[in-house]
């Protein structure tokens, strides 16, 4: 398999698991076995523990500068904010509506990139986003929305903004050049801690 095909395959596989995770967490939370935040903590903690041995070995071979470490930790904070905001929106939105709204992530990345870096958005990109918006409209059952649904929409939009900030921050700081195992381990570890603090804080509000 050529490097290009291998990269495309891994990217599709990554997208599959990224999309599967919230579906599984939503189903688990509805059974009462765990809350949304509990599911997120388990997700990020297990990922961190699985990556930890490989991350330590890679970090020992090539230590990460403190500046890049801080930048990576901030990426983890944005990741935690993205997930926590999305799952918080489910308190006011049906799960299907919340997931549909999350498809706005690419649109926010495009708009933020255009605003910050003055990038031109191609007609093809607008067409793809228009198709996504039509899909969201078809997936959303507006009659199922509860009173106060605007709060859920606000949290879903905050989640999309956090995701866009995560993408733009990583691109601006060239974090894709870092060791992927070390980077992912730090991001998921920070996200697990961030979600835990969010869960504790919400319990005392």
Regions found by a protein language model. Name each.
Residues 19-20, 45-49, 107, 133, ...:
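Small-residue-rich packing faces within the transmembrane alpha-helices of Major Facilitator Superfamily
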